[in-house]
């Protein structure tokens, strides 16, 4: 079964993905993130057609502790964050979490 990419974030963040063909998205305006982001993440986590969730790194700060733990611990769908200050180490942690080993370990 083929799974899709879903994008969660502000309309400015999701628009580029939508133009690139991503069909599943949750628009949450910046001023509503504290109230609506948890619900958007929960809906997306429960969608069996989604294999990857893309969010902006800074949006994780708007999630409740439970929602943040759920999305960070989720194997399928896998969370990929962009932006923020995580940089290469953030990507390294995401890969390690997804496959269970550190490919860059010496």
From Swiss-Prot:
| Task of the protein | Component of the A-type ATP synthase that produces ATP from ADP in the presence of a proton gradient across the membrane.
Q: Does the keyword Manganese apply?
A: no
Which gene name does the record give?
A: atpF
Q: Does the keyword Cell membrane apply?
A: yes
GO cellular component: a single term: plasma membrane
Locations listed in the record: Cell membrane
Query: How is the quaternary structure described?
Result: Has multiple subunits with at least A(3), B(3), C, D, E, F, H, I and proteolipid K(x).
Q: How does it sit in the membrane?
A: Peripheral membrane protein
| Record's protein name | A-type ATP synthase subunit F
List the Gene Ontology MF annotations in alphabetical order: ATP binding; proton-transporting ATP synthase activity, rotational mechanism; proton-transporting ATPase activity, rotational mechanism
**Major location, coarse class?**
membrane
Q: Which residues form a coiled coil?
A: none
Q: Which is a GO BP term held by this UniProt record?
A: proton motive force-driven plasma membrane ATP synthesis
Indicate the family of this protein.
Belongs to the V-ATPase F subunit family.
**Keyword tags:** ATP synthesis, Cell membrane, Hydrogen ion transport, Ion transport, Membrane, Transport
């Amino acid at each position: 079964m083929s799974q899709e990419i879903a994008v969660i974030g502000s309309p400015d963040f999701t628009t580029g993905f939508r133009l690139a063909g991503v069909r599943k998205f949750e628009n949450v305006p910046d001023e509503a993130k504290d109230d609506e982001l948890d619900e958007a993440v929960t809906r997306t986590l429960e969608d069996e057609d989604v294999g990857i969730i893309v969010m902006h790194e800074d949006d994780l700060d708007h999630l409740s502790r439970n929602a943040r733990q759920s999305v960070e611990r989720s194997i399928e769908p896998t969370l990929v964050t962009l932006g923020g200050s995580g940089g290469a180490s953030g990507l390294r942690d995401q890969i390690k979490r997804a496959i269970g080993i550190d490919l860059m370990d010496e």
